[in-house]
């Protein structure tokens, strides 16, 4: 189950309506409605960008891949807004911050957000588990290149278990406890670092608590 399937009933309105409420580009509405013809005819540049992402889509069609991408943006944007309301100075910083499907060659690996506290600032990566994998297996897996980048940036990692309404924070400015796995089936045989959740506890999801925990780490 990807973001699109998991979030179908998450909001009081359909996802394409939520996208419109957030002011998303019409291309994202076509994607959420699985209207490939409308996307191809009315947003040809976006459609071509989506096609270039074929290698990222696993067994999904290009439209299914796009639906998961746009649905995850909706959840992230709502999360960011709620954290701002809770007093956190947080802004989007990634290549996809404009919420448009980019050609794969233009997608960078930078962190999703930047959090500021006075003159201090830190990058923060947001990752969501829509299937409850972390709770079920008591571990979270990060691609090796993402993990190494977070260490270089001394970034924060905010993991949200959407299925079980939990969250965790990892401060990559500190030495992290992770096990290297050179080949993980869920990532197409690519290497990952696995984080044992005995060391990184999942907490009950609450926006105020998340904001306080982040501020305490900056």
Residue map of PLM features:
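Conserved catalytic cores of phosphodiester-cleaving nucleases, focusing on short active-site segments
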Residues: 79, 111-132
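Short, flexible/disordered intra-domain loops and linkers
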Residues: 64-68, 99-104, 132-141
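Mg2+/Mn2+-dependent nuclease catalytic core
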Residues: 129-153
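Active-site metal-binding core of divalent-cation-utilizing nuclease and nuclease-like domains
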Residues: 93-120
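Interdomain/boundary linker segments immediately adjacent to catalytic/signaling cores
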Residues: 1-87
